[in-house]
Amino acid sequence: MAEGGGSVQRLRRQLESNSFQAEQYVKLLSQQSDGDRDLQEHRQRIQSLADETAQSLKRNVYQNYRQFIETAKEISYLEGEMYQLSHILTEQKSIMESVTQALLYTDRSEAARELQTAFPKEAEEGKVRNLTTLLEKVEGCKNLLETPGRYLVYNGDLTEFDVDNMALIQKVHAFLMNDCLLIATSVPNRRGIYKYNALHNLDDLAVVNVKENPPMKDMFKILMFPESRIFQAENAKIKKEWLEILEQTKKNKALNEKQKQEETTPQLPVVPEIPANPFIDEDGTFDEVEVDLTIDWIQELPEDLDVCIAQRNFEGAVDLLDKLNSYLEDKPLTHPVKELKSKVDERVRQLTDVLVFELSPDRSLRGGPKATRRAVSQLVRLGQSTKACELFLKNQAAAVQTAIRQLRIEGATLLYIHKLCNVFFTSLLETAKEFEMDFAENHGCYSAFIVWSRLALKMFVDAFSKQVFDSKESLSTVAECVKVAKEHCKQLSEIGLDLTFILHTLLVKDIKAALQSYKDIVIEATKHRNSEEMWRRMNLMTPEVLGKLREEMRNCGINNFDQYTGDDCWVNISYTIVAFTKQTMAFLEEALKLYFPELHMVLLECLMEIILVAIQHVDYSLRCEQESEKKAFIRQNASFLYENVLVVVEKRFEEGVGKPAKQLQELRNSSRLVRVNPESTTSVV
C-alpha cells in the first residue's frame, strides 16, 4: 500500500514538472511496460490521481466560492462607479473646453475690433494683402480681386465626402471671404498650389452641423440649392470655428447690406413737432417702460448658471431661472430683456442637455428609480414634462432588462421563476411609485406609463416563457410558475395598477399549447394501457398499499371507494380504470391552476377528449367480451367510471370554474348510447 502511495506521489511530481512532455512520456512508458497488465495498473494510478486532483479542486472552489462571489460583486460595483466617474469627467472636460473656446473667441474678436478701430485703413489694406497673397496660390481666380471691399476672413484644409454614401472624394482648401466661399482643390505634384473648384455666395448657402457617427465625425454640411456638400475638419475645435465664423460672416454681410440700404434711402422731410395734448397723461403711454436689469444677481445670472451647470448643481440653476421668471413676469418685453433672455435660453438648453444625459440608459443603473428623481424633477420644473417622462421610462426599461439578464439560470425552474418575478414586479412597483411621485401634477403622462408597463410585461413574459414553456416542463411545474406570476401581478393592485388581464393575454397562447400537449400525453398513456387491458381485479398484496390507494382516491374526490374493495387486499376495479382516474384528476387539478376565462373552451375540449377515450374503450370491451364473468366485471368498471369518476370531474370543474359544464353532463348522459360494431376488433376513438 505504501509502495502504491509512493508511486502515485512520484507520478504526481513527474506530471507537475515544467519539463514534462506527454509524447515522450507515453513513448517511454510503452517501451518499459511488460504487457497489458502494467499499462492497466499505470492507467489506474493516473485515474486515481485525476480523481484526487478533481476533489481537491472542488474543495478549493467551495471554500473560496463566497469570497469569489463577493469579489465579483465588488468588481461590478466598482465598474459601475468608474463608468459613471468617466462620464462625469468627460462632461466636465467638454464644459471647460466650450467655456475656454468661447472666452478665446471673444478675446480675439474684441482685439480685432480694437485694432480695426485704431487703424482702419491699415487693417483694410492688411486684409486685402492677405487675400492677394493666398489667391496667388489658386489657379483660375484672378478676377476675385476685382470686387472692391472683398477680404479674407478665414481659410483652412478640409476633406470632402460624398453626400449619398459618405465615400472620400478629395482634399480641398476653403477660403472664406466676407461675401463668398471659395473651394479649391490641391494640384498634384505641386505643394501649396491649388486649383479653382467652386465659388458660393454667402447669401445662397446654409451651414448645417452633421451629427457625430464614428468614425465619421467633425463634419458639417453646406447646402446650396439644389445640391449640398459635406466637409470634414481636422478636429472638433476647427469644425466649431468653421461653423461659428461662417454664421458670423453671414450675419455681418446681411448687417452691412442693411446699413448701406438705409444710407442710400432718401431722408424724409422733417415734420414739425405737434403740440402736446394737454389731456394725455404726462407720463405718456408711448414711452417705453424701462426694466431695471442692473441688479447684481441679474447681471451675474448667466455666469452663475454656467457655474451651477459645471458643478452639477441642477437645483440651484433651476432656482435661479425661477427667480428670474418671477421677476420678469409683469415686466414688458423690452430690447434689453430680450437680450438677457437669449443669453439665459442658451444656458437652459445646456442644462436640459445635461439633465437628458443624466437620464440616459448609458448611465449607471444600480440606483433604481430613485436615482433619476433629481434629474426628472428639474426637467419637470423646466417645463419638459413629456421629455422627462419619456427618458425616465426608457431608463427604467433598460434597468429592468439588465436586471433580468443578470439573473442566473441555475437549479429548478420554479426557483428561477420566483427570482424572476421578484426582480421584475418589485422593479415595476418601485417604478410606478416613483412615477406617481415625480409626475403627480402631470396627469397626461399616465397613459405613457400604462403603455410602458405593457411593453415591460411583454419583456417579462418573453423571459418567463423561454424558461417555462420552451424547456417542456411538466404541467404541474407550469401551473406553479404561472401561479407565482399571477400572485406577484396582483400585488400591483395596491397602487391601482391591474395588469392581470394583459398577463393573461400574453400567456394564453403558451398555456393553450401546454394543455394540449399534456392532453396528448394523457391520451397516449391511456391508449397504451387500454391495449394491454386484461379486465382483472387488482391484488395489492399488503394493507399498506391498499390504504395508500384509498387515500389517493379520496384525494381525487371519490369518497365511496371502499365499496369497490374486497377481502385480502383485492380491489374490484381494473388497473386501467384506476390509473385513468388518477391521471385525469391530476390533469384537471393542474389545469384549474392555470384557468382563466380565455382558456374555458380549451380546457373543456381537452377533458372531453380524454374522457371519450376511456368511455369508448369500456363500451367496446363490454360489447366484444363473451365471458359472462368478465362481462360483469366490465359493467362494474363502467359503473365506477360513469357514476363516480365523471361525476367528480364535473363537480370539480364547476368548483374551479364557477359554473357548470353542460358539455360534460351531456357527454356522460349520452355515452351509454355509443354503439360500436361488434365485429370490429379495434376501439373507436
Swiss-Prot record:
UniProt-annotated stretches for the region Disordered: 254-273
Q: What subcellular locations does the record give?
A: Cytoplasm; Cytoplasm, Perinuclear region; Cell projection, Growth cone; Cell projection
Q: Give the matching Gene3D superfamilies.
A: Exo84p, C-terminal helical domain (1.20.58.1220), Exo84p, N-terminal helical domain (1.20.58.1210), Pleckstrin-homology domain (PH domain)/Phosphotyrosine-binding domain (PTB) (2.30.29.30)
Cross-referenced SUPFAM superfamilies, in alphabetical order? Cullin repeat-like (SSF74788), PH domain-like (SSF50729)
Q: Where is the composition biased (Basic and acidic residues)?
A: 254-263
Record has RNA-binding as a keyword: no
Any GO BP annotation: protein localization
Give the main localization category: cytoplasm
**Alphabetic keyword roster:** Cell projection, Cytoplasm, Exocytosis, Protein transport, Transport
Gene Ontology cellular component terms for the protein in this record: exocyst; growth cone; perinuclear region of cytoplasm
Q: By its UniProt entry, which InterPro entries does this protein fall under?
A: Cullin_repeat-like_dom_sf, Exo84, Exo84_C, Exo84_C_1, Exo84_C_2, PH-like_dom_sf, PH_domain
Instruction: Supply the Pfam families for this chain.
Output: Exo84_C (PF16528), VPS51_Exo84_N (PF08700)
Report the residue ranges that make up the PH domain in this protein: 151-251
According to its UniProt record, which protein family does this protein belong to?
A: Belongs to the EXO84 family.
| Family annotation (PANTHER family) | EXOCYST COMPLEX COMPONENT 8
Q: How does it assemble?
A: The exocyst complex is composed of exoc1, exoc2, exoc3, exoc4, exoc5, exoc6, exoc7 and exoc8.
Q: What functional role does this protein have?
A: Component of the exocyst complex involved in the docking of exocytic vesicles with fusion sites on the plasma membrane.
Q: In its UniProt entry, what is this protein called?
A: Exocyst complex component 8
